[in-house]
A protein has these predicted regions:
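N-terminal helix-turn-helix DNA-binding core of bacterial DNA-binding proteins
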Residues: 2-46
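Basic, amphipathic "hinge/linker" alpha-helix immediately C-terminal to the N-terminal HTH DNA-binding motif
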Residues: 70-89
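Short beta-strand/turn micro-motifs at beta-sheet edges
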Residues: 1-4, 62-64
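Amphipathic alpha-helical dimerization/coiled-coil segments
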Residues: 85-112
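Beta-hairpin "wing" of winged helix-turn-helix
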Residues: 55-71, 76
């Protein structure tokens, strides 16, 4: 998928991946890739800065955990993050409906 298509949608996708519960950064990357059948195989240099931005905005929070002797950060939605995800889903629904209607229209009405 072309990176420019992701612009403006990454935050909503990250919030959606965290909706079911906490995930560490690499698990977020895997969920995006697996949930999109490989179309969203994003580098850590894209995902981690976005996670940190969402945390600074108060939409997610993180906690350190130790697994098999290794420390890693687990991210999860806050109440504000859940509300933001709900709002972004509504906007996406409206946008995708309009774009689909335009792209699939055939034939276009004649203009005078």
């Amino acid at each position: 998928m072309r990176p420019e298509l992701l612009k403006g949608h990454l935050d909503a996708l990250l919030l959606a991946v965290l909706e079911d519960g906490p995930r560490h950064g690499y698990a977020v990357i895997e969920a995006l890739r697996d949930g999109s059948d490989g179309a969203l195989d994003l580098p850590t240099g894209t995902v981690y800065p976005a996670l940190h931005r969402l945390e600074r905005a108060g939409l997610i929070r993180s906690d350190w955990e130790t697994v098999s002797g290794r420390r890693r950060r687990a991210y999860q939605l806050t109440g504000s993050g859940r509300q933001a995800l709900s709002d972004q889903r509504a906007v996406w629904e409206q946008f995708s409906t309009a774009v689909t209607a335009l792209l699939m229209r055939n034939p276009w009405p004649a203009t005078t």
